[in-house]
């Protein structure tokens, strides 16, 4: 419709009509104060255009439509949803998305339908308000400023893409340093020797069945005796092989290690046209390959690790440099999980790249990997933290926080772990990481850590200022983290953090002890008169997770309190009684049932983490001494970087 057709008509003094060739005044311009002049038409048009821009601009910030429909319109029952087959997801992982020790994203569906409805409505309001603010800010800019911002952003992205695609001219030669503490003598105590041998036999059972029924595939289905693949890895194969390499090495399963190495050399291929989880591929594949190189010195592992690292660089092609969660390995196009706070990146995912990327720069001689993860630090340090806490969601386009949901479990967990370990791995020179860690821990203690009526210490979740008194299995890693960082704590606080680690270990042991299977649920609650018990059906499963064993390992190494070996052996017996089947080890759908209901997946992290931590608990401390080795979020081993190899200089304020 022509603009003139939208404007009002005014009667002229002569009785004609102005505003179009109507009546006797056709073709004559109106005159006098009643006539609508050209400048007024332009102003009205501009106002109308601004209104349309605000309305349509908001659409792009609404949540994913499928999430909205399922959460708001259909009120789907979480109890009817199957347990996830794999590790998250922060972590999360909607089959493949909702898990994450981001270290893994939060698994399972939200709680009751009414809460889900309220969460979705709050999210819509928040996204709508953000869209209006951003549209108003854009309208206030001059056209020249908008054009300049667009050109600068395009130039930055183009420069990053060009730089990342520049071919590596071969890897520089490096002097392989023989690893410290990778061979240990047998424990002197016969009972401990027997228990350690049992755990090695468990590894053989898991490995041999994977080899027999799923060789070259990602994971094993031990009941149906076939392969299991998760979309987390796209078309990349061999997750269990790469994840198990360092466990095979330290258990001195030399023949199996050589088999795995040959498969990597001949079959591990990253030239695939598929979308992968940057976080999961980094901690499992990059971490596993780096660890295998540092233990064995085999060049193929260094080559493959750097090759994969280069493939992951396009994930950082965002305006802020905060990487995408998902990346197409062929096209280099990234995106985020559609359910993650309006397309935000997840703290536990982009915060769990630092250790591996610093080592990639160390082994390749190319600083680009270190620069990418140090930029993440720069972005985070510019942001205001609500109550000193780090929300789980960060928008990679705006560089601003998404929903103010804070968790030390799924979606947040390994970010905090990597701050502490970045300082330790730098030979205690990365003072910025140390400060960020202890500042975060202080805020966590103030706002999240609580004690139940019976004296159990737990870590709640923070949602916009309100606490949810729930603790996930993923959160149980924090006991070991607090204890590991105790020596570096501010003056007079070392014993406090060691005791805090012990209290978290006790709480997580209680979550195991209060089930029929003596294995812990995915999440447990402290409300409605219950303590350390899962009350929702979608939180009662156990998928061979390692976090409790991880905390037991650190607590044993740092205190030598025999109860940690006792608790670890209880877990071994429970795994043998309830998870072991003829075809390997399977997760359980409900740890409170009298009879097993299997999920039919042998997770790759069971070999990489759970069995490794158990083996170390029943080994002497000279096997992988903590002063020389750091464990990544998948329990892969990374040595302390020597001081003369620092990629980034950090000065204490």
From Swiss-Prot:
Report disulfide bridges, numbered on this chain. Answer: 476-508
Matching InterPro entries, A to Z? 6hp_glycosidase-like_sf, Glyco_hydro_47, Glycosyl_Hydrolase_47, Seven-hairpin_glycosidases
Sorted alphabetically, the Gene Ontology BP terms of this entry are: carbohydrate metabolic process; ERAD pathway; Golgi apparatus mannose trimming; mannose trimming involved in glycoprotein ERAD pathway; protein glycosylation; protein targeting to ER
Q: Which UniProt keywords apply?
A: Calcium, Disulfide bond, Glycoprotein, Glycosidase, Golgi apparatus, Hydrolase, Membrane, Signal-anchor, Transmembrane, Transmembrane helix
Is-annotated flag, keyword Iron?
no
**E.C. code:** 3.2.1.113
- Explain what switches its activity on or off, per the activity regulation comment: Inhibited by both 1-deoxymannojirimycin and kifunensine.
Cellular location(s): Golgi apparatus membrane
Pull the Cytoplasmic topological domain ranges from the record: 1-41
Gene Ontology CC terms? cytoplasmic vesicle; cytosol; endoplasmic reticulum; endoplasmic reticulum-Golgi intermediate compartment; extracellular exosome; Golgi apparatus; Golgi membrane; membrane
Q: Where are the transmembrane segments?
A: 42-62
* Cofactors that this protein relies on: Ca(2+)
Sites of glycosylation? 513
What does the similarity note say?
Belongs to the glycosyl hydrolase 47 family.
- Protein name from the UniProt record: Mannosyl-oligosaccharide 1,2-alpha-mannosidase IA
Say which species the protein is native to: Homo sapiens
Gene for this chain: MAN1A1
